[in-house]
Each structure stands twice: as structure tokens, then as C-alpha cells.
């Protein structure tokens, strides 16, 4: 084997991109089967495949970064660029949902009764659960920043406390969102209002679940002393993602819950 004379990480062949793509296909097909035929077999298979892929891919990345030292400063720089581009792509993803919402609400068609919210839709009160959700996410933004500063100062105990609080707030937000969906007087099939509301807030809810999973992995890694004050990009990426989720919610709250009601 030739000796490596550069700082770049030559990644070994991995099956996880393939199994990840397969799980995405199974989940999207499974959602269609669930919506139209009330069958959960494909969706469950896709979710299990996705969870197994996440576990094994995270395990490999942790092994390469923490135990094999492949994440040199130049590799970390590349990962930072990658994470920034990923968050930009997510911003554009949500831009499409906001576009659909404003396109429908600023010039309501006669079929909607020429008004917004459409005739027959009883929107959620923005000063009840949505406002509580806003305060929960803003508080989690404060606690994740506290965790980050504690980590940079080498205060392990406070970092774990702050990270645990952030995860708890993320789970609480998800439970509040689920209860709100359960109690809503309209559904995703109630015209353009129902579809834009549930798709935009639902995808944001999915991002909160993904972000919470990301933070739980960081919490478990910190318990095992994986992070140092100057080598913790895994946590930094999770914190960036969480702040992005916070900001998107503020736009959702102001646009869909407050102005849209």
C-alpha cells in the first residue's frame, strides 16, 4: 500500500448511500400506499431500512473522524462548505412552500370564495399552541448556543446539561405539533389552505425530528468523550442545522399562523 502524502480523506467504498437511496424509495412509495390503500408494510420497511442506514453510516463517520483521525483541518473545511450548501438547499426547498402559500393567499381564486382563509376553513389561533411552539424553539436556540459555548470552554457538565435541555425542548415541540394536528378542524385534503399548511408545517416538523436525532447522537458522543474544545464539527453542524430550523419556524409562524389566519 502506498503512503498517503496529502491531508485529504480518501473514503472507502460504502454501501450506505445505496441503502439510503433504497430506503428513500421505500418510504416515498410506502407513503403513497398508506395514503391510497391504507397499507403500512412498505412504509415500515422503508423506515426500518432508513434507521439501520443512519446507525451504520454514523458509526462509520465516527470511526473515521474520532478513532482514525481522517478529519484533518482541510477535510473539516470541506465538510463545513458541504453543510453550508446543504442548508442553502434546504432554504430553497422551503422557499417553494412559501411561494405556494403566498401565490394562493395573496390572490384567492373565486373557488376559495375570493377570501383567505378560504370559506369554511377555521384556522388555528396563532396566540395559543403556535405561540407556545415559537417560545419552545426560541428557548432551544438559546440552550444549543449555551451548549456550544460550554464545549468551547471545556465545560463538559454544562455542555451535557444544555444539550439535554435542547433535545427535551425539541421532543416537546414535536409532541405539541402532533397534538395540534390531531385537534385541527381541517385536513391536508381541504383545498389549497390545508395542503400548503400541512406540507409546510409538516416538513418543518420532520426537520425538527431530524435535528433532534442529530443532537441525540451528539449527546451520546459527548458522553463517550468524543468532542474536544477545538475538534467538534459534528456538534457544530448539528447546531447550525438547529438554528436553521428555528429561523424557518419564525417565518412559518409569521406567514402561515399569524398573517394567514
Curated annotation (Swiss-Prot):
- Disulfide bond positions: none
Answer yes or no on keyword Magnesium. Answer: no
Q: Where in the cell is it found?
A: Mitochondrion inner membrane
GO CC terms, sorted = mitochondrial inner membrane; respiratory chain complex IV
Q: Transport as a keyword?
A: no
Record key words, sorted? Membrane, Mitochondrion, Mitochondrion inner membrane, Translocase, Transmembrane, Transmembrane helix
* Enzymatic reactions: 4 Fe(II)-[cytochrome c] + O2 + 8 H(+)(in) = 4 Fe(III)-[cytochrome c] + 2 H2O + 4 H(+)(out)
Query: Where are the Mitochondrial matrix topological domains?
Result: 1-15, 67-72, 153-155, 224-232
Q: Name one GO biological process term.
A: respiratory chain complex IV assembly
Q: Mind telling me which PROSITE patterns this protein's record contains? A: COX3
Range of residues in the leader sequence: none
Q: Where are the transmembrane segments?
A: 16-34, 41-66, 73-105, 129-152, 156-183, 191-223, 233-256
For this protein, what is the EC number? 7.1.1.9
The segments annotated as topological domain Mitochondrial intermembrane are 35-40, 106-128, 184-190, 257-261
> What is the role of this chain?
Component of the cytochrome c oxidase, the last enzyme in the mitochondrial electron transport chain which drives oxidative phosphorylation. The respiratory chain contains 3 multisubunit complexes succinate dehydrogenase (complex II, CII), ubiquinol-cytochrome c oxidoreductase (cytochrome b-c1 complex, complex III, CIII) and cytochrome c oxidase (complex IV, CIV), that cooperate to transfer electrons derived from NADH and succinate to molecular oxygen, creating an electrochemical gradient over the inner membrane that drives transmembrane transport and the ATP synthase.
Similarity field: Belongs to the cytochrome c oxidase subunit 3 family.
In terms of PANTHER family, this protein maps to: CYTOCHROME C OXIDASE SUBUNIT 3 (PTHR11403:SF7), CYTOCHROME C OXIDASE SUBUNIT III (PTHR11403)
Spell out the subunit comment. Component of the cytochrome c oxidase (complex IV, CIV), a multisubunit enzyme composed of 14 subunits. The complex is composed of a catalytic core of 3 subunits MT-CO1, MT-CO2 and MT-CO3, encoded in the mitochondrial DNA, and 11 supernumerary subunits COX4I, COX5A, COX5B, COX6A, COX6B, COX6C, COX7A, COX7B, COX7C, COX8 and NDUFA4, which are encoded in the nuclear genome.
What is the name attached to this protein's record?
Cytochrome c oxidase subunit 3
Q: Which gene encodes it?
A: MT-CO3
Amino acid at each position: 500500500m502506498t503512503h498517503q502524502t496529502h491531508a485529504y480523506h480518501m473514503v472507502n467504498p460504502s454501501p450506505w448511500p445505496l441503502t439510503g437511496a433504497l430506503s428513500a424509495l421505500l418510504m416515498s412509495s410506502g407513503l403513497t400506499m398508506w395514503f391510497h390503500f391504507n397499507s403500512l408494510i412498505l412504509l415500515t420497511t422503508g423506515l426500518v431500512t432508513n434507521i439501520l442506514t443512519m446507525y451504520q453510516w454514523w458509526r462509520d463517520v465516527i470511526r473515521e473522524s474520532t478513532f482514525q483521525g481522517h478529519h484533518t483541518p482541510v477535510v473539516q473545511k470541506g465538510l463545513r462548505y458541504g453543510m453550508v450548501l446543504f442548508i442553502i438547499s434546504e432554504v430553497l426547498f422551503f422557499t417553494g412552500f412559501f411561494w405556494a402559500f403566498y401565490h394562493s393567499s395573496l390572490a384567492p381564486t373565486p373557488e376559495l370564495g375570493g377570501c383567505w382563509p378560504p370559506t369554511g376553513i377555521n384556522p388555528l389561533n396563532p396566540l395559543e399552541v403556535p405561540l407556545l411552539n415559537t417560545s419552545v424553539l426560541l428557548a432551544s436556540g438559546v440552550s444549543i448556543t449555551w451548549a456550544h459555548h460550554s464545549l468551547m470552554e471545556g465545560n463538559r457538565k454544562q455542555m451535557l446539561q444544555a444539550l439535554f435541555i435542547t433535545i427535551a425542548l425539541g421532543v416537546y415541540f414535536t409532541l405539541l405539533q402532533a397534538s395540534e394536528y390531531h385537534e385541527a378542524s381541517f385536513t391536508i385534503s381541504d383545498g389549497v389552505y390545508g395542503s400548503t399548511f400541512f406540507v409546510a408545517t409538516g416538513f418543518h416538523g420532520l426537520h425538527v425530528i431530524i435535528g433532534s436525532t442529530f443532537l441525540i447522537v451528539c449527546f451520546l458522543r459527548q458522553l463517550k468523550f468524543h468532542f474536544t474544545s477545538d475538534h467538534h464539527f459534528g456538534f457544530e453542524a448539528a447546531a447550525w442545522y438547529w438554528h436553521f430550523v428555528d429561523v424557518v419556524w419564525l417565518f412559518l409562524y409569521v406567514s402561515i399562523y399569524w398573517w394567514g389566519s
